[in-house]
């Protein structure tokens, strides 16, 4: 019976060939899946129960029934165990998406890998798999969860501070062999992948985000953005490390060999990580003291190539003196370090600009030197000194960015405020002044020598011309008339004035005579245009050459500005034009005001009296409604019957009443003749008058009801004799009317016929003009 039932059983639908696994290979597939779940252990560690469960069905069929039942029970346990493992592996596969293969940081397996970590991992996983072994596994696993993922995103780059949880597995320094990392390859963060191949230590991470997190001495990796800009990547750890790296703006990083102290492999769930630019920040307790290794000759050359693209064509020579940090001047971002202020010395060609020194403070952050293409430079010669960039000169400058865009160095002199100490100026007095005329310290000396005498003569004219043209100048340029005294007392003369004016300051400040001539040309109505943002904003070109003369020059600027503005303010002040009572004192204004005032009366009187406005009366001629009269001045208690009783004599010929209000009504007659006849009669209770003399309301009522003002014709006299005769003949009943009544109806009908015949004959006689007496 069982064979027949099995023969009649419906066969299940076979799956596709691509997914179909033959019966002979099913046991092998289960073995392979279980082996993969157990961390790729040696084949000697396959449990005995599992081997027995994987025997072919033919062997189990040859056993006795009792053994088969026992084997089936054990097989059921094995199947349950495999299903549990399969569900666990499925959960782990769900947590790691399809990008698991791309995001792993693969490394070679070594013979000297950590034994304690692997044994701990094996002990954690052994109860699940049911395997007991004494040989450690050859694979490290990432922690399953993380405590905190802090993401701080600013612009295109961000800081991810990753701290593994206490439950996450960490490999100590004693467990990991001391070997240097080699052939580190870093991929683009924008592609959500981060591959580090060819590592000698075995580190396997299965996170979704780039998770190559390792700390080792003398190595700081550099992550590459999509545009090729280098980002310093540092790693966090609890142990001391002393990383040092060679970072260049073109994205290259050189690592010095060292030993691995700590390898931390953080990981986390996939839902906690985003595909953003990742920058791991290091908090190292060690120190890095290197100047040549931090930024070598190759880094300098690459920086020079980057800065050459700037319109100023400056070559950058970076000298970094740091004690606890690593600085990359090409990266525009902030790095936390305790190092002192680093100085970026910028050397320029003598034919273009002066020497600029860019001070970079690492506590405040990096400043990108290459971003000054469309911005003008403000140069301040400060009192600090740095290592000489060119022979025979020593200067220190700060490159700032002005608010206005200027890519041309010919406008460079309009935005310069120079101040220098006596010590740099004394050092600048050297035999190489003529050779290094492009430096700003020599610029101040030679410029002071050349224009000391000419500037004194021209400043007086400049103040006079500015005072005359103050009303027409949108931007006031003031100069100090006593500047020559400060220049002569503190500065020495030199012989290279003309060359300095052409090379350093350009053609905008060749001579002060051009400024004087330009201001004099304003009087002759020639154009002198300057760019401005506001009329209240003024550009002051002041030149001071020592710390002691800074206060003096500021005071002189203030006095000159007040003097220039005072000349125009006296003329336009309210006190000079009006007295305390508010009367005008200026005769010119009095003449102007008195001449423009008109004494003629210009008020236009209204043509209409809007207060006594009345609507025009409705003009109704007598011929428009001649058959209508107005009935007025009667008591309010009167009704229609009372008025009809008064005009009862005209009711037979046709008469009707139309009410206007309680005391006014319209009387409509059959003809104008009857209406004129009614106007001739006098009544004691009412008064009558024609419609042309009626009130405005009565006229409006008459015009509104014009089509209803015709008198209604009387209904002709009829009898029911014909109707009664038709009903009797149709129903076949006898009439109940008496003989006398019937004769009276016949008589009325005959009279009506006769009257109708006479009216028709009279109408005809009227048209024919016949005499009606005959009738």
From Swiss-Prot:
Biased amino acid composition, Polar residues: 235-247
Modified residues (Phosphothreonine): 695
Keyword Amino-acid biosynthesis (UniProt): no
Any coiled-coil regions, as ranges: 734-766
Alphabetic keyword roster: Coiled coil, Phosphoprotein
Biased composition (Basic and acidic residues): 1-16, 65-112
Sites of Phosphoserine modification: 671
Region (EJC-binding motif): 7-27
Chain positions covered by the region annotation Disordered: 1-127, 235-262, 755-775
Domain of life: Eukaryota
Database matches in PANTHER family: COILED-COIL DOMAIN-CONTAINING PROTEIN R3HCC1L, GROWTH INHIBITION AND DIFFERENTIATION RELATED PROTEIN 88
Subunit structure: May interact with the exon junction complex (EJC) composed at least of CASC3, EIF4A3, MAGOH and RBM8A.
Protein known as: Coiled-coil domain-containing protein R3HCC1L
Annotated source species: Mus musculus (Mouse)
Lineage: Eukaryota, Metazoa, Chordata, Craniata, Vertebrata
Gene that encodes it: R3hcc1l
């Amino acid at each position: 019976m069982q064979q027949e039932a099995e023969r009649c059983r419906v066969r299940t639908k076979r799956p596709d060939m691509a997914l179909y696994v033959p019966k002979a290979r099913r046991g092998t597939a289960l073995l392979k899946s279980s082996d993969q779940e157990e961390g790729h252990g040696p084949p000697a560690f396959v449990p005995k129960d599992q081997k027995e469960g994987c025997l072919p069905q033919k062997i189990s069929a040859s056993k006795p029934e009792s053994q088969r039942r026992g084997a089936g029970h054990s097989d059921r346990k094995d199947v349950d165990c495999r299903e549990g493992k399969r569900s666990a592996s499925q959960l782990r596969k769900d947590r790691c998406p399809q990008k698991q293969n791309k995001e792993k940081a693969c490394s070679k397996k070594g013979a000297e890998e950590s034994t304690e970590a692997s044994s701990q991992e094996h002990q954690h996983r052994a109860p699940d798999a049911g395997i007991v072994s004494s040989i450690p596994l050859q694979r490290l696993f990432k922690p399953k969860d993380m405590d905190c993922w802090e993401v701080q995103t600013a612009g295109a780059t961000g800081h991810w501070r990753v701290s593994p949880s206490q439950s996450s597995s960490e490999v100590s320094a004693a467990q990991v062999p001391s070997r240097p990392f080699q052939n580190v390859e870093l991929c683009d963060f924008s592609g959500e992948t981060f591959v580090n191949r060819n590592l000698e230590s075995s580190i396997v991470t299965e996170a979704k985000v780039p998770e190559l997190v390792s700390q080792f001495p003398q190595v700081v990796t550099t992550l590459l953005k999509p545009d090729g800009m280098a980002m310093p990547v540092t790693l966090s750890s609890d142990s001391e490390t002393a990383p040092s790296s060679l970072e260049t703006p073109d994205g290259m990083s050189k690592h010095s060999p060292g030993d691995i102290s700590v390898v931390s492999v953080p990981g986390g769930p996939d839902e906690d990580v985003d595909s953003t630019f990742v920058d791991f920040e290091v908090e190292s307790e060690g120190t890095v003291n290197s100047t040549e290794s931090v930024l070598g000759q190759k880094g300098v050359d690459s920086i020079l190539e980057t800065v050459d693209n700037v319109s100023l064509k400056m070559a950058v020579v970076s000298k970094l003196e740091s004690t606890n940090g690593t600085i990359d001047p090409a990266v525009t971002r902030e790095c936390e370090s305790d190092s002192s202020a680093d100085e970026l010395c910028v050397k320029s060609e003598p034919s273009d600009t002066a020497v600029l020194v860019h001070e970079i403070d690492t506590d405040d952050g990096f400043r990108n030197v290459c971003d000054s293409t469309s911005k003008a430079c403000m140069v301040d010669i400060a009192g600090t000194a740095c290592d000489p960039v060119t022979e025979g000169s020593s200067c220190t400058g700060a490159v700032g960015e002005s608010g206005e865009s200027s890519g041309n160095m010919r406008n460079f002199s309009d935005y310069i405020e120079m101040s220098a100490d006596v010590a740099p100026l004394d050092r600048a007095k050297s035999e190489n002044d003529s050779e290094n005329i492009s430096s700003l310290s020599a610029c101040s000396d030679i410029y002071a020598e050349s224009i000391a005498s000419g500037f004194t003569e021209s400043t007086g004219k400049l103040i006079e011309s500015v005072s005359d043209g103050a009303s027409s100048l949108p931007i006031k340029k003031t100069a100090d008339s006593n500047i020559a005294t400060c220049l002569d007392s503190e500065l020495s003369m030199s012989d290279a004035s003309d060359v300095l004016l052409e090379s350093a300051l350009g053609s905008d400040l060749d001579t002060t005579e051009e400024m004087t001539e330009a201001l004099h040309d304003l009087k002759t109505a020639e154009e002198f245009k300057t760019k401005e943002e506001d009329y209240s904003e003024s550009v002051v070109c002041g030149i001071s050459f020592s710390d002691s003369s800074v206060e003096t020059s500021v005071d002189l600027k203030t006095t000159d500005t007040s003097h220039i503005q005072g000349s125009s303010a006296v003329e336009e002040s309210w006190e000079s034009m009006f007295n305390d009572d508010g009367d005008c004192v200026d005769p010119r204004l009095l003449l102007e005001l008195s001449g423009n005032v008109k004494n003629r009366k210009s008020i236009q009187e209204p043509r209409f009296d809007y207060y006594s406005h009345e609507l025009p009366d409705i003009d109704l001629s007598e011929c428009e409604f001649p058959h209508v009269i107005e009935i007025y001045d009667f008591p309010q208690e009167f009704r229609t019957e009372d008025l009809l009783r008064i005009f009862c004599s005209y009711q037979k010929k046709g008469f009707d009443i139309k009410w206007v209000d309680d005391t006014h009504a319209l009387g409509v007659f059959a003809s104008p003749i009857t209406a004129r006849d009614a106007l001739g009669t006098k009544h004691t209770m009412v008064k009558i008058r024609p419609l042309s003399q009626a009130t405005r309301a009565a006229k409006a009522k008459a015009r509104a009801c014009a089509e209803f003002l015709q008198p209604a014709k009387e209904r002709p006299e009829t009898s029911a004799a014909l109707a009664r005769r038709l009903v009797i003949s149709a129903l076949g009943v006898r009439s109940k009317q008496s003989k006398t009544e019937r004769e009276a109806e016949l008589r009325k009908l005959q009279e009506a016929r006769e009257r109708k015949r006479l009216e028709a004959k009279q109408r005809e006689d009227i048209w024919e003009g016949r005499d009606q007496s005959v009738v």
